[in-house]
Amino acid sequence: MAYLFLFCAIFVEVVATTLLKSTEGFTRLVPTLACLAGYAVTFTLLALSISRGMKTDVAYALWSAIGTAAIVLIAVLFLDSPVSVAKVVGVALIIVGVITLNLADAH
Protein backbone atom coordinates (compact mmCIF):
# COMPACT_ATOMS: atom_id res chain seq x y z
CA MET A 1 0.00 0.00 0.00
CA ALA A 2 2.93 2.33 0.68
CA TYR A 3 4.06 2.13 -2.95
CA LEU A 4 0.53 2.87 -4.17
CA PHE A 5 0.43 6.06 -2.09
CA LEU A 6 3.91 6.99 -3.32
CA PHE A 7 3.12 6.54 -7.00
CA CYS A 8 -0.15 8.47 -6.59
CA ALA A 9 1.88 11.24 -4.92
CA ILE A 10 4.30 11.26 -7.84
CA PHE A 11 1.47 11.42 -10.38
CA VAL A 12 -0.28 14.31 -8.60
CA GLU A 13 3.03 16.17 -8.16
CA VAL A 14 3.77 15.88 -11.87
CA VAL A 15 0.30 17.21 -12.73
CA ALA A 16 0.65 20.09 -10.24
CA THR A 17 4.11 21.00 -11.51
CA THR A 18 2.90 20.89 -15.11
CA LEU A 19 0.15 23.34 -14.12
CA LEU A 20 2.73 25.87 -12.90
CA LYS A 21 3.19 27.34 -16.36
CA SER A 22 -0.56 27.90 -16.77
CA THR A 23 -0.72 29.88 -13.50
CA GLU A 24 1.28 32.65 -15.21
CA GLY A 25 3.13 33.54 -12.03
CA PHE A 26 0.13 32.73 -9.82
CA THR A 27 -1.92 35.47 -11.49
CA ARG A 28 -4.62 33.13 -12.84
CA LEU A 29 -6.94 31.96 -10.07
CA VAL A 30 -8.19 28.56 -11.25
CA PRO A 31 -4.84 27.10 -12.36
CA THR A 32 -3.22 28.52 -9.22
CA LEU A 33 -5.79 26.89 -6.93
CA ALA A 34 -5.50 23.59 -8.82
CA CYS A 35 -1.71 23.72 -8.58
CA LEU A 36 -1.70 24.49 -4.85
CA ALA A 37 -4.32 21.81 -4.17
CA GLY A 38 -2.21 19.33 -6.12
CA TYR A 39 0.83 20.05 -3.97
CA ALA A 40 -1.24 19.67 -0.79
CA VAL A 41 -2.51 16.29 -2.01
CA THR A 42 1.01 15.29 -3.05
CA PHE A 43 2.51 15.89 0.38
CA THR A 44 -0.43 14.15 2.05
CA LEU A 45 0.07 11.07 -0.13
CA LEU A 46 3.83 11.14 0.46
CA ALA A 47 3.23 11.29 4.22
CA LEU A 48 0.78 8.38 3.98
CA SER A 49 3.36 6.37 2.07
CA ILE A 50 5.94 6.94 4.79
CA SER A 51 3.45 6.25 7.58
CA ARG A 52 2.60 2.93 5.90
CA GLY A 53 6.17 1.71 6.29
CA MET A 54 8.19 3.09 3.41
CA LYS A 55 11.54 4.45 4.55
CA THR A 56 11.72 8.23 4.28
CA ASP A 57 14.97 8.31 2.31
CA VAL A 58 13.74 5.80 -0.26
CA ALA A 59 10.31 7.45 -0.56
CA TYR A 60 11.78 10.90 -1.08
CA ALA A 61 14.42 9.67 -3.51
CA LEU A 62 11.86 7.85 -5.64
CA TRP A 63 9.37 10.73 -5.44
CA SER A 64 11.88 13.36 -6.48
CA ALA A 65 13.66 11.26 -9.11
CA ILE A 66 10.60 9.92 -10.90
CA GLY A 67 8.88 13.29 -10.63
CA THR A 68 11.90 15.11 -12.04
CA ALA A 69 12.31 12.68 -14.92
CA ALA A 70 8.60 12.89 -15.75
CA ILE A 71 8.58 16.69 -15.66
CA VAL A 72 11.63 16.89 -17.94
CA LEU A 73 9.94 14.51 -20.37
CA ILE A 74 6.66 16.46 -20.31
CA ALA A 75 8.48 19.78 -20.71
CA VAL A 76 10.39 18.49 -23.72
CA LEU A 77 7.38 16.82 -25.36
CA PHE A 78 4.62 19.33 -24.63
CA LEU A 79 6.02 22.62 -23.28
CA ASP A 80 8.62 23.40 -25.94
CA SER A 81 11.60 22.88 -23.66
CA PRO A 82 14.75 22.12 -25.65
CA VAL A 83 16.56 18.81 -25.22
CA SER A 84 20.18 19.06 -24.20
CA VAL A 85 22.96 16.68 -23.32
CA ALA A 86 23.05 18.21 -19.84
CA LYS A 87 19.36 17.39 -19.27
CA VAL A 88 19.77 13.81 -20.45
CA VAL A 89 22.89 13.28 -18.33
CA GLY A 90 21.23 14.92 -15.32
CA VAL A 91 18.16 12.70 -15.48
CA ALA A 92 20.36 9.63 -16.01
CA LEU A 93 22.41 10.52 -12.92
CA ILE A 94 19.23 10.95 -10.86
CA ILE A 95 18.01 7.52 -11.94
CA VAL A 96 21.40 5.94 -11.16
CA GLY A 97 21.32 7.61 -7.75
CA VAL A 98 17.89 6.22 -6.93
CA ILE A 99 18.90 2.74 -8.04
CA THR A 100 22.02 3.01 -5.86
CA LEU A 101 19.95 4.06 -2.83
CA ASN A 102 17.55 1.17 -3.33
CA LEU A 103 20.37 -1.35 -3.75
CA ALA A 104 22.12 -0.03 -0.64
CA ASP A 105 18.84 -0.31 1.26
CA ALA A 106 18.45 -3.95 0.19
CA HIS A 107 21.73 -5.00 1.86
Swiss-Prot record:
User: Membrane topology for this entry?
Assistant: Multi-pass membrane protein
Could you list the residue ranges that cross the membrane? Answer: 2-19, 29-51, 58-77, 82-104
Q: Name one GO molecular function term.
A: transmembrane transporter activity
Record keywords, A-Z: Antibiotic resistance, Cell membrane, Membrane, Transmembrane, Transmembrane helix, Transport
Q: Which InterPro entries match?
A: Small_drug/metabolite_transptr, Small_multidrug_res
This entry carries the following GO cellular component terms, namely: plasma membrane
Q: Name one Pfam family in it.
A: Multi_Drug_Res
The record's Gene Ontology biological-process terms are: response to antibiotic
Quote the subcellular location field of this record: Cell membrane
Q: What does this protein do, in the record's words? A: Multidrug efflux pump. Confers resistance to tetraphenylphosphonium (TPP), erythromycin, ethidium bromide, acriflavine, safranin O and pyronin Y.
Family under the similarity heading: Belongs to the drug/metabolite transporter (DMT) superfamily. Small multidrug resistance (SMR) (TC 2.A.7.1) family. Mmr subfamily.
The protein depicted here goes by the name Multidrug resistance protein mmr
Supply the source organism for this entry: Mycobacterium leprae (strain TN)
Query: Mind giving the lineage of the organism this protein is from?
Result: Bacteria, Bacillati, Actinomycetota, Actinomycetes, Mycobacteriales
